[in-house]
């Protein structure tokens, strides 16, 4: 989901049992609080720019207070992580219910088939939510570590 244009772009998942849940997930992003989505978009870009500019300034030895730059990076990383994880967790948790409701209303599968798919969604979400949170945490930690190393040079 692209917040600025209010458009959903989905990979080719036609032959996947996760198709309905994936569509539901992206649709849920489109109805999340617009202010949070726009904040996430703007803040994510500021976060990336801060990281790149800090690296460049550190490499050309233009940073006087290295601890201040690193502390700001840690602070920005926390904000980035909490906003992104909130948006992703919210969409991942709710997508299962939206997908299940759609399959029941559309009557495209039997109750047993729907139950099997929903059970698969539960397994997928159990792993997926943890994985997304881990990935976001690692992404912020790695950026912070890279900046710390460059600041030491």
Spans of model-derived segments:
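Hydrophobic alpha-helical transmembrane segments
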Residues: 59-74, 153
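Alpha-helical transmembrane segments of multi-pass membrane proteins
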Residues: 73-85
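Post-HEXXH active-site segment of zinc metalloproteases
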Residues: 33-63
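Polar-ligand-bearing catalytic/cofactor-coordination segments
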Residues: 1-43, 82-131
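Juxtamembrane boundary at the C-terminal end of a transmembrane helix
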Residues: 147-153
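Detector for methionine-enriched segments
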Residues: 67, 73, 92, 103, ...
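Select subsegments of transmembrane alpha-helices in polytopic membrane proteins
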Residues: 39-49, 130-144
């Amino acid at each position: 989901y692209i917040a600025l244009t209010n458009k959903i772009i989905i990979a080719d998942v036609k032959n996947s049992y996760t198709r309905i849940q994936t569509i539901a997930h992206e649709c849920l992003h489109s109805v999340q609080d617009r202010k949070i989505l726009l904040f996430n978009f703007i803040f994510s870009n500021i976060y990336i720019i801060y990281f790149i500019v800090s690296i460049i300034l550190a490499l050309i030895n233009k940073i006087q207070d290295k601890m201040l730059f690193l502390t700001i990076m840690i602070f920005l990383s926390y904000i980035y992580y909490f906003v992104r994880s909130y948006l992703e967790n919210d969409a991942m948790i709710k997508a299962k219910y939206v997908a299940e409701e759609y399959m029941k209303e559309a009557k495209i599968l039997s109750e047993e088939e729907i139950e099997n798919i929903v059970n698969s969604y539960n397994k997928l979400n159990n792993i997926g939510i943890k994985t997304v949170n881990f990935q976001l945490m690692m992404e912020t930690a790695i950026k912070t570590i890279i900046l710390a190393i460059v600041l030491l040079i």
